[in-house]
Amino acid sequence: MEATFCFVDLAGFSALTETHGDDAGADLAQRFAAMTQSALRDDGRLVDTVGDAVFLASETPSRMLRAVARLWREAEATPDFPAVRAGIHHGDAVLRDGRWFGTSVNVAARVAALASGGHVLATSAVAAVARTEGIPVEGLGFVALKNIRERMELFSIVIGADSGSAVDPV
């Protein structure tokens, strides 16, 4: 089954937790999960959370891009909120008991791991949709993703102006 997958987390979350304690980290992670749920509306589903990371699924790249754009605006508008980073991929996966499995999910996670605070990285199918919708896209070339056989072409998707986000949470 085809779907669009996205992993989003907070840049500097480990440093924040180390400096301000586990309770502060848990509070921020819960706040971010609630912010994410609100931003999704009907454009996607919050599949899971782990620490500060959220795993999202949507029917199409277009719907995922809308949801991520809303999440970005919310994070950027929140004073002293850490910078958000994301990776998005569209492809085939298996849905069982409300959970997604497969290489496409793994690719989205690996792409997210390469993103720095304030940036959205995506693979070619998502970037193509972003371009058709007038969203600025910058090619980054082909990269090798850990434990993924094929090199993937990555793109930076310009969703928001990351200047409003706090990058160093300590």
Regions inferred by a protein language model and the residue ranges of each:
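Catalytic NTP-binding/metal-coordinating core of nucleotidyl cyclase/transferase enzymes
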Residues: 1-66
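Juxtamembrane helix-loop transition sites at the ends of transmembrane segments
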Residues: 30-33, 42, 113, 140, ...
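Catalytic beta-strand-to-alpha-helix segment of the class III nucleotidyl cyclase homology domain
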Residues: 55-164
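Short, charged, solvent-exposed linker or helix-capping segments at domain edges/interfaces
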Residues: 164-170
